[in-house]
Amino acid sequence: MPRLKRSEAERRGAETAGPDFLEALARGLRVVQAFDREHRQLSLSDVARRVELPRASVRRTLHTLVHLGFAATDGRMFRLTPRVLNLAGAYLMSNAISDILQPAVERLTAEVGEACSAAVLDGDDVIMIAHASPNRVISVNAQIGLRLPAVSSSLGRVLLAALDDRQLDRLLGRIKPAKLTSATVTDRAELRRAIRKARDDGYALVDQEVEAGFRSIAVPLRRLDGSVIASLNIGAHSNRGGADAMRSLLLPKLRALAAELQNQMI
């Protein structure tokens, strides 16, 4: 396990910061930086070795990050969550992600004439990070920053499909699915089947479970290494063609865009 080397600037900063320097904050930021493309999940011992800090200090830091929602754990391995993006503020959200995804969903909306969105998983919800609609109103609720239940939305189900069975069972055992419409699936066994189907099929289609009269289809967006980073969907009023039409006409467009964007994801 390679160690995370401190830059010369970091060393000088710590040495010359003076009495107001917060060592605990510095340790916390260093623990966050232990995770990268090659180290997406780490054990407590792995983190301690990489940052060269005592296990007790790293344990407290990781516990705090999990408690605040910036990290997640299965009891042994730790990983960062999308909430870490908040640490970088608007710059990271608007420039690193939306600068790629927002023009892409706008282009797809112009091509298919339906609403298109992108989202990331945050806990039990998805957060919409890019959205475009045609001139007509599709959904009064759709907007960047909107949170939706992951288990009920097409954007969320393709993200949950990337979880292993143990992680999925833990999530389904924890949540209390809300009955958003008369069509919303709340039975945990049915939700498990729907998410596993999304895993097998490579897409999820949700019919009026989040909003009455609104149907959507989604695919995962992957990094170059194959890991899922976000999801893309197309949504339309249920009177604008059926589910089969979505699969035959819109799904190929979504998959083509996801394949194109994969080359830009790091």
Predicted regions: what they are:
Residues P2, V228-I266:
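Juxtadomain coupling helices with adjacent low-complexity linkers
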Residues P2-R11, V137-V210:
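Short, solvent-exposed recognition segments
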Residues L221-L224:
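Sensor-regulatory modules in signal-transduction proteins
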